[in-house]
Amino acid sequence: MVVTSSAGCASRPRGRGRWPRLSRRSGCLEVPGRPRRPFLRPTVPGPTSARPRRGRAPHGRSTRCTGWRVQLSFSCPPFIKNRQFQFYLIRSPFSRVGYGLSDVNSSSLLGLWGIKFFACWENSNMIYIFKMLGYNQDKLPITSERLVPMASSISPEKLGAKIVEWYSCIVSREVEQAEEYKQEIGQLVNQLERSDEKVLSYYSLVLFRHQLLTEDVQQKRVEPTSLQAVNVEDTIYDGLLAFLYYFMSGQYEFYEGRYQSALRLYKIAEQKIDHVHDQSEKAEFYFRLGESYFAHHQYTFAVSYLEQAIDLFENNNFIWTILNCRLLLAAIKTELNLFDEAEKEYQSALADATPYPTTHALLLRALGLNRVRQRKLYEAEMYFAEALTIGDHSKSVEGLKTKANLANVRLRQNANNAEAIRLLQEAKAGATAIHLEECMVRCAITEALYINEGRDERLTSELQRLLEREFYTEYSELAEEIAEYYKQQSLLEKAFYYMKEALHYRTNMKMIGVEQQ
């Protein structure tokens, strides 16, 4: 817990609304309306009863600060999984009390300023922790205590400018620099000289976008915690903030496989596009919108937005993003059975992708899917296997899907392939660990078809899981694969049924895309 003394702060208000403070004489925690009680004394050298003068650290060490605070580190009770946290109650120079909770392990801000903190965490027993800290310290395992100066405050305008720089690094995919900005800004948020809900909402949105960026190289799912922290009311009268809110919300829906919801949110964001003046940000949005239309099999709209994105990205020399656009254009040609044109696009992009391992691996994976579409399973196997050797692709979420694809094409060629069975179980376990529903179903259907020889009841139940989650694209693809399997087994009635299902849901996705227009 961090409780700031009144050094360097505005005078304490009278009556209700006063905050707990550390007495300079007794070293006790004084709480309005409660008797004075002993408080853990700070462990810095020198007398602890004397309050440091404004802007002066103990023993004459000069520092710029807005006050002093007692900082307690502690382990949370079991319901917070025993992670290390620091809880603080900070008195700002602008007569406002700030509450927050910092995770020591990741240095990420988990709380917001002001009363909203309690509103956000009331259902998670955070008030209980606060009471334990303030009035029942003997029940909480305090791990350390120290007197530290509060860092220099920062204005919302300067913090907002920092966040803009951070977001630019994210858009340009400068991962290391973006990570540095994340760590720096995560600390600066605690030093706001006055609360600004718009800046905090902007911070939460960019933090979520950062998580989407780093997900490419981490085998874990992105959680919408920072997105949920945004006060939607703050976006109503701010066009740029509204754009970012709907854009990021759309990305999360797409990430979760809810393509219809994602496209709806993207179309709302498109109405706010005039408030965006950064051309690279516009290009990123058009790319995501084109990607969403591709998922709906609305290829005309997808190509239009992807070409707009390429034009804007070329002006900013964002090579890797141009490669991603070209990857989708080639995938569209594959879906339209224009295999020769798709091959030229893929090979051209592949030649430029060597310096970008993440995109390089995705291109190899896309080439594997292209070969699956053409029933060239051996070539598909080679591309999937090569993709897993590039960069950190094998450790990423997309890498789990590639492992499932590789196991699938190997088992389709030889159902007794022990290495393929091992790889399938590895992909299945990884997908289960992070609740990657689509990959879990793909693994289960591969197992049912090629290891358990087409058990109808298992196939039906797994496909139903996709329908319940509205994964219509995945349903269509897997139904088509099942139809091909039964066709090879000369079970034409079953093959016809599943092919009809595949066509139905492919058409359904096209209709949804038209409705969004």
Swiss-Prot record:
Keyword terms: DNA-binding, Methyltransferase, Repeat, Restriction system, S-adenosyl-L-methionine, TPR repeat, Transferase
UniProt key word tRNA processing: no
The protein, known as: Type II methyltransferase M.CeqI
Example GO BP: methylation
Region (Disordered) location: 1-21, 33-62
Catalytic activity: a 2'-deoxyadenosine in DNA + S-adenosyl-L-methionine = an N(6)-methyl-2'-deoxyadenosine in DNA + S-adenosyl-L-homocysteine + H(+)
Leader sequence residues: none
Feature: compositional bias, Basic residues: 51-62
Gene3D superfamilies, sorted: Tetratricopeptide repeat domain
Domain of life: Bacteria
Classification via SMART domains: TPR (SM00028)
Taxonomy of the source species: Bacteria, Bacillati, Actinomycetota, Actinomycetes, Mycobacteriales
GO molecular function: DNA binding; site-specific DNA-methyltransferase (adenine-specific) activity
Keyword Transcription: no
Function text: A methylase, recognizes the double-stranded sequence 5'-GATATC-3', methylates A-? on both strands, and protects the DNA from cleavage by the CeqI endonuclease.
TPR repeats: from-to residues: 283-316, 361-394, 476-509
Organism name: Rhodococcus hoagii (Corynebacterium equii)
EC number of this enzyme: 2.1.1.72
Enzyme class, UniProt record, top EC level: transferase
